[in-house]
Amino acid sequence: MTAKTLLGKAAAGVRTSRITRAVPADDGRRKGAHLLKVRDVALFADIIGQGYPLLLMHGGPSLDHWSLTPFRELADQFTVVFYDHRCNGRSVGAPVSSMTFENLTADAEALREELGFERWAVLGHSFGGHVALEYALRYPASLSHLVLLDTGGEARWSQQNAPELLARRGYSPRMVELIRRWFNGEFAPHEYVPMAMRILMAGVYSYNPSLWQIAREELQGGWHTKFRPQAFIFAGRHLLKGWSVMDRLAEITAPTLVMAGSSDFVFPPECQRELAAGTPHARLQLIDRAGHDPHSEQTAEVMAAVRHFLSAETPAA
């Protein structure tokens, strides 16, 4: 969950190639914001730019692609594919009970096929990072690069550790309990916005929260967000209960960038080190003076890191 949207190593012996090769021809049908029918859903997608394809998986759940608005600047170098997960944002056609990792990843794979890309890079933020990890494990042949932004390989970091970390940081017992309920989906849909506002105004997601920072992030696109509280509740109560891929990280074959704000309370540095250590071809980069949304707080540094990573030599299919 982002502050913005709450409010409004290569493998040895493997041939390498530049990421700029084998870019599909643009047919005009892909570009712009529209609904794309794939499988049993219509996914809202916004495709911009030209170059090697980069799929962005947003967090939440309950949010949409607007939470990743700062990444629009990468369109000068890449074809950037924003989309809303099923049951999130402006995507339509499926009940919230269908929001499983099997369906979420199959949707992304069907989207790749619909857009005509052989492979692509995938960036997942927060919950989107969970989906990206599952995608890397289920569809390795479709993935050239993996960027994991402020995420973890198991749900205990948000559902159990995050409240405990806030308590150690001196937050009130009421706020700690609110965060515990929040990440475990222990609330009704009508409570979503009031709870989100309390959490946002407490500044837990940001390194240096201020009204100016909130206003600046809203101007970047957060006010466009369409909230879907039921998705967040379903994830907390069902989808993420006991979820972990930590015992399967060694299966990930794609070069991986693990990146996060050094002050993130949801997926703190120890989580990032654990994630990077378990992933064979991963590099770790912590962003100073940033919390859960470093792409909003330290935009230039994050964009430079992603550009550098995606432009490096990479294993070929």
Write out the residue ranges for each language-model feature:
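Active-site loop/oxyanion-hole signature of alpha/beta-hydrolase fold enzymes
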Residues: 82, 87-127, 304
